[in-house]
Amino acid sequence: MKKGRGLALLLAGAILPALSGCLLPPDAPSVLASAGGTGPDDAYVVYSVEQEYEVLRLLGLRPERQSLHIIDGRAFDVIIATNPETGEARDVWFDISRFFGRL
């Protein structure tokens, strides 16, 4: 085995297990498929404000108003959003506990 290849394998063996604990947040389509966003027990779990707006975009909704709710120690954004084609408004719940209040 070449010296450089052995070093690469050694480094990979040390780095890959360490990185296995680093999980990326799910993408917006995965978030969308995981819940319905109809209330605190069915809220979309998101990892950023940008992800909230990406979910709204995928739903075809336009945000109108937003409010913060703290329920049982969990933080939720409730966005009243409108379907631009029908004018129908609905509340969309997002669980923002994973990033709310963190720098």
What are these regions (language model features)?
Residues 1-10:
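Bacterial N-terminal signal peptides that target proteins for export
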Residues 18-21:
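C-terminal motif of bacterial Sec signal peptides marking the signal peptidase cleavage site
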Residues 23-25:
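Bacterial signal peptide processing site
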Residues 27-30:
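Intrinsically disordered, low-complexity, charge-dense segments enriched in Lys/Arg
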Residues 33-52:
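Solvent-exposed, low-complexity, repeat-rich "mucin-like" stalks and linkers
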Residues 57-67:
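Charged, amphipathic alpha-helical segments
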Residues 68-103:
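Short, compact, well-ordered microdomains
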